[in-house]
Amino acid sequence: MLENARIRPGEVVLDVGAGDGLIAFGAMPLVGESGRVVFCDVSQDLLDHCRNPDQELEVAGRAGFVRAAAEDLSPIPDGSVDVVTTRSVLIYVQEKHAAFREFHRVLRPERRVLIFEPINNYFPDDMDDFWGFDARPVRDLVEMIWVSEGRDASNHPNDPMMNFNERDLLRHAEAAGLDEVHVELVVDVEPGAWVEDLERLVGTAPNPNARTTGEAIAAALTPEEAETFEAHLRPLVDAGRGRWRGARRCDPVGPTSP
């Protein structure tokens, strides 16, 4: 992602939805001593987590920390940034068009945006699959879990994680005034598992706003149903007999219009 951003020494990088700083810290050596990286997130706890080990960067003027949402970057002045990066952030934003307008506003003319987003609705809903594992014998229980979590297809228009695809993001980018847009859609289907055992699966949440898989199972199923469900999954998960599928969009966007 950072390679595609083409960050140069002396530039100002704004990482929107910085989280634990994966992208922002990676940009620090690229901007050099004369550049600056701004960590931006809605979570003050995450900003504090990023700030603590690198106070010297803030004192030296090489790092900034701003609490703001992608769709409202009002603390960031107009035309003050050379590069905007955002990774797996827009899936949590309902007003995606507003986020793109804010990206355009804070960018200097002829600068760029780099976006990496999973396209969660690329694959159709499949009740025969549960997080990459064959669930055909317990299909009815899978359906009960997803309905309980509001993940049936009827709710997709209201779910910011599911109500868009790569074409929608392209449309938002153009409407915001980003003149040159390059889109790369990457789709992967691979054998294997993304978790080592059932305990890790049930302890995992699909996103920071969601319940863990175990909590979702407990909320949707009776204890007897949950026992049946986990008894089916355990040998598959523990042996890694699954299939991983993913679709994501990575696109450098720019330059902005003057």
Which residues does each predicted region cover?
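A short SAM/SAH-binding and catalytic strip from SAM-dependent methyltransferases
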Residues: 82-97, 119
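Conserved alpha-helix/loop element of class I SAM-dependent methyltransferases that forms part
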Residues: 1-11, 26
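A short glycine-rich, Lys/Arg-flanked "PGG" loop and its adjoining helix->strand segment in the class I
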Residues: 97-112
